[in-house]
Amino acid sequence: MSTGNVTTLRRPEAPPSLPAGTEAKIEHHARPAEGKVAFSFRNVTKSFGDKPVLRGIDLDVREGEFLAVIGKSGCGKSTLLRILAGLDTPTTGTVSKDPSNRTRMMFQEPRLLPWERIANNVSVGLTGIAKGEAAREQALGILDEVGLKDRAGEWPYVLSGGQKQRVALARALVAHPQILALDEPLGALDALTRIEMQLLLERIWRKQKFTAVLVTHDVSEAVALADRIVVIDEGRIALDLDVKLPRPRRHGTPEFARLEEQVLNQLFGRGDITGQ
């Protein structure tokens, strides 16, 4: 047994297109086949004082699945993520996962140590796992994955916001976790940097095959990245939706737009206005 809120949700005016040169051959990457479950929530509740935040959450997520959790501010999605990461405990119910599986978490703020150089910031993710030259080599390897190996000896203050989040992603991934919990990690980035980070995250997820759980307010981001989208409303799962689109995904296609509309309809309590 394993053992927050951000900006107000707003509907995007128009989903951004991928930058020139980022499109690739269409590949089908379906949800993982029925198989081993990475973690399960069973009737999980969480209250703070007399205020219920999660109400009877039942959820199974398979190994290698990319799950997006979306909902309005205060709905309980970040609390769910903190319970998964072991940073909080449920009031009632159980969370089951293999105790040998590492879980790491990435936040909206990079939370880098200003007194440590970039490589040492990444090595923090290896505390209790590796140290010395072995830790440095692993840190340099994952920095290479995120495109920042040449900045390993620099200080955090010289990096842009997007580069700092790349370092935070490297720190979360350096120990090769089986589960990566992402709490609105791209929310503070500008639109182009955000798309670049989405592409980077998807590429590394497909390579390392970890289970990803992304909390986001961005419906377009959820459809672009996830195998499956769960909408939380007032502490309950209101929608559990498979995203059966080929990767890489193209914003603005009719299929992409229909999925966005389905999620938005649930979030805003509307009937189906698409005519589909």
UniProtKB/Swiss-Prot annotation:
This is Aliphatic sulfonates import ATP-binding protein SsuB 1. ATP binds at G71, K72, S73, G74, C75, G76, K77, S78. Belongs to the ABC transporter superfamily. Aliphatic sulfonates importer (TC 3.A.1.17.2) family. Its EC number is 7.6.2.14. GO terms for cellular component: plasma membrane. It comes from the Bacteria. Keywords: ATP-binding, Cell inner membrane, Cell membrane, Membrane, Nucleotide-binding, Translocase, Transport. Signal peptide: none annotated. It is a peripheral membrane protein. It is an enzyme of class 7 (translocase). One of its GO terms (molecular function) is ATP binding. PANTHER family: ALIPHATIC SULFONATES IMPORT ATP-BINDING PROTEIN SSUB, TAURINE IMPORT ATP-BINDING PROTEIN-RELATED. InterPro entries: AAA+_ATPase (IPR003593), ABC_transporter-like_ATP-bd (IPR003439), ABC_transporter-like_CS (IPR017871), ABC_transporter_ATP-bind (IPR050166), P-loop_NTPase (IPR027417).
